[in-house]
Amino acid sequence: MSRFVQDLSKAMSQDGASQFQEVILQELELSVKKELEKILTTAASHEFEHTKKDLDGFRKLFHRFLQEKGPSVDWGKIQRPPEDSIQPYEKIKARGLPDNISSVLNKLVVVKLNGGLGTSMGCKGPKSLIGVRNENTFLDLTVQQIEHLNKTYNTDVPLVLMNSFNTDEDTKKILQKYNHCRVKIYTFNQSRYPRINKESLLPIAKDVSYSGENTEAWYPPGHGDIYASFYNSGLLDTFIEEGKEYIFVSNIDNLGATVDLYILNHLMNPPNGKRCEFVMEVTNKTRADVKGGTLTQYEGKLRLVEIAQVPKAHVDEFKSVSKFKIFNTNNLWISLGAVKRLQEQNAIDMEIIVNPKTLDGGLNVIQLETAVGAAIKSFENSLGINVPRSRFLPVKTTSDLLLVMSNLYSLNAGSLTMSEKREFPTVPLVKLGSSFTKVQDYLRRFESIPDMLELDHLTVSGDVTFGKNVSLKGTVIIIANHGDRIDIPPGAVLENKIVSGNLRILDH
């Protein structure tokens, strides 16, 4: 929170100050409105309407930001969800599949969140275009999955990509390679909002461009923006007119987020005859997931609570694996009709995430964002489904990439499944050091991906390279201290080993 708002909060505690505070907030809103109007005048005629919608959306979000004070949840009101509000996946699966699978599939639209760049893994351009398996990218695998469904069941499930202004151009260039595939692909852009100065709370952008000194002035406001952007794009109405009823939304970097026919059947043919408007897939927490958002019961409705909303005194309790056993995978099944109704009623309520950033020049700014899952409380008859961990396979780092490239997984029609040769269903814990952060460096350090079928835990730190056909089993820790280098020789088998010091293998 900025110093400006902190000062206002102090003023709240003084008698008669709330009226003064109200005036200050109104002045600030007026200043922001004027700045946004100035920015809008710089828009070319072909981008005027689109820019106006974006800036109007930002103004509403900014207004809400000024109204909110303190943590957005009252900890005393948080309860565990009732038993029937989170169903085990096994129960959903036990209902089986309908005789006519194509009839339910034809009601579905697959939406992938494709706004992110590959910068955290040292790549330029959209993250979805990074190669993850046999030179297939995230996007390739997604298209293969949906094409397989359409061919197998003779259906017409479309793929929709929610791009950001950061990923749109590069993604569209690549889409032509799928022209021959049996998948209709649509795109729409999430909004482009102005970053605001942390102290003055005014937009730092001077015009609508996002090049030159304005490059850092704009941001995509989180995936909660999907509801407004999807509606504004016209695609929502198009799909409703075509008879589609549900969207399956997931992050494009979650390789476990495939279309699940059992969940879809449960949505289309509910046992009690009452359709769910919103289903969130959750899975059991491990100690690695303590920061993930969790589903709770709050004021009589299911509500997603994120760590940022929790009062400081209760953060440890929130992280507890025993009290809050599940977390949100961000695999969501949402009724198209409900999105349209709520969007038109302006009734989708999502908590604001205040994301502070420091720009390259040292300026401190704030991004106001929302998360797609936070809207669960706005929908009727919402449900959580506790799914197997295999439906949550995100690739955020090269450590994750090593797992999905390895023989732990088999690839079939774009879907990754745990190898049958792995004796236990858990995934090894892999921690690669900073020398492996960038994909380019990571690939250079592995002549081939090691055999990891019997691996439990791998930690690698420092200047380490792996020869061909290395096998890793049990717990393996490899640490090259500063100035040292370790080359793991081709064909080496490391089982429950700690390797440190210096090990050079030189060609002769």
Swiss-Prot record:
Pfam families (alphabetical): UDPGP
EC nos: 2.7.7.9
Modified residues (Phosphothreonine): 426
Amino acids binding UTP: 113-116, 127, 190, 222, 253, 396
GO terms of molecular function: D-glucose binding; identical protein binding; metal ion binding; pyrimidine ribonucleotide binding; UTP-monosaccharide-1-phosphate uridylyltransferase activity; UTP:glucose-1-phosphate uridylyltransferase activity
UniProt catalytic activity: alpha-D-glucose 1-phosphate + UTP + H(+) = UDP-alpha-D-glucose + diphosphate
Catalytic-site annotation from UniProt: 396
N6-acetyllysine sites (modified residues): 438
Keyword Metal-binding assigned: yes
Keyword tags: Acetylation, Cytoplasm, Magnesium, Metal-binding, Nucleotidyltransferase, Phosphoprotein, Transferase
Binding site for Mg(2+): 127, 253
Sequence positions bearing Phosphoserine: 13, 434, 448, 461
InterPro entries attached to this UniProt entry: Nucleotide-diphossugar_trans, UDPGP_fam, UDPGP_trans
Pathway as given in its UniProt record: Glycan biosynthesis; glycogen biosynthesis
Highest taxon in the source lineage: Eukaryota
Places the protein is found: Cytoplasm
Recorded family membership: Belongs to the UDPGP type 1 family.
Summary of the function given for this chain in its UniProt record: UTP--glucose-1-phosphate uridylyltransferase catalyzing the conversion of glucose-1-phosphate into UDP-glucose, a crucial precursor for the production of glycogen.
Name of the protein described by the UniProt record: UTP--glucose-1-phosphate uridylyltransferase
Organism: Mus musculus
Gene (UniProt): Ugp2
